[in-house]
Amino acid sequence: MSDLLSRRLALLGAAANLPLLTECLHGIERECLRVDSDGKLALTPHPRALGSTLTHPQITTDYSEALLEFITPTETDVADTLGDLERIHRFASSKLDGEYLWSPSMPCELPDEESIPIARYGSSMIGRLKYVYRKGLALRYGKTMQCIAGIHYNFSLPERLWPLLRQAEGSELSERDYQSAAYIALIRNFRRYSWLLMYLFGASPALDAGFLRGRPSQLERLDEHTLYLPYATSLRMSDLGYQNNAQAGLTPCYNDLQSYIDSLRQAVSTPYPPYEKVGTKQDGEWVQLNTNILQIENEYYSSIRPKRVTYTGERPVQALAARGVQYVEVRCLDINPFLPLGIDLDEARFLDAFLLFCAFSDSPLLNGECSDATDNFLAVVKEGRRPGLQLQRRGQPVELQVWANELLERIADTAALLDRARGGEAHAAALAAQRAKVADAELTPSAQVLKVMRERGESFEAFSLRQSREHAEYFRQHPLAAEEQARFEKMASDSLAEQTELERDQDGDFDTFVAAYQASILGLISN
């Protein structure tokens, strides 16, 4: 164990401080496509019974009208977070009228690009802005890529913990700057070690052959309708996904918060010639919010983001600049198609131990390690289960299995501390489940997906639809209690009323609204 990690764990293990570790906050966002009874993309509007996608706090859409997003409230106990997520699923599932929630991350058979419906948010200024932003995404990246779903895991350490560490380490940074620097250090370590999450939890080794739209690839054919790679863990996170020339040169620096803010601010204010050629309007209709490298900060695709809860009308980078980092959003997790919620307690508890390990371990600046971190990540998503696969560690080759076992040995100390804080051995058990996967790659979700498809002679689509139906049956057999159902019904109707009020009360024109929104980022100049 590194000196810094052992010192921090000893400090937090003291009787007076141990309860702090029960105050970490968790939130989960789960995306999933709506599909019809045959497993094809649902072309129906967002069910009104689920409420307004603009104003509902827990049920919205991501890119497409058919791409649902479920958002839990924050909880200190991740078991409660998963309970929240299950209740959202139960309610939504009861309102789908013969449609299903698609079980994996990679999409079902999709119609042609033109027919994939972009999410609608009504006629308010902000609703129209969200729609135009998505039109811009279609223009820049194509609609097909935007139909990939994932799980986002939001995690924060208790605010009371940072002053304790800052004082113990004699830092001269302000409390806010110390906290931000610590989260950025967590992100640097996440970049170093996130390949491990791809090995353990990647669950997208195969996809529907039509997804590539005829483009050449290195993928192999499993059957007439399915492409795959034999040792892949997460094709979702491979370079099949969100690769784009405009973003290729955009590598936000994780050396400190200000440089990260500056790089994103530059990207949302720097024109990109191919986008300039298209312009923001065609035949008087908006087609993208601007012609810059990024329309808004959230367009930047990354496996983890520093975050701060925003005020109404505030942009993410403004919130970070004004008040510092509050939590991290892990964005690289596949949906496990065997699980009704796409994630379970073992995975969540391991993520907590992993993120605490990243937060408390020594985290030097990445500098030359950046390319190694990217190469390791891409190697694991494409061939993570290949026997003897070698990664790069500080410029030297190391076998994945050797490095994974060493990391799990170190993460065991944070898992043990979490168990001491909460009582029981749940985190140790979650860690043991991951050790078993490192010892035997056949236990990983990606291997299990291919195993079941081969054993049953199923295409990707047939496997996924069967799992989707099984999950729907699970939710049907576990309906919400009447009181909970009524609470969700009220949340839906309240959100519809709120959207109606927004649309009634607005004035001004959309062009002026967009101009003001664009201008809001330009004041964030580094001091």
UniProtKB/Swiss-Prot annotation:
It holds the Pfam family Glu_cys_ligase. Gene3D superfamilies: 3.30.590.20. Its EC number is 6.3.2.2. It catalyses: L-cysteine + L-glutamate + ATP = gamma-L-glutamyl-L-cysteine + ADP + phosphate + H(+). Pathway: Sulfur metabolism; glutathione biosynthesis; glutathione from L-cysteine and L-glutamate: step 1/2. Belongs to the glutamate--cysteine ligase type 1 family. Type 1 subfamily. PANTHER family: GLUTAMATE--CYSTEINE LIGASE. This is Glutamate--cysteine ligase.
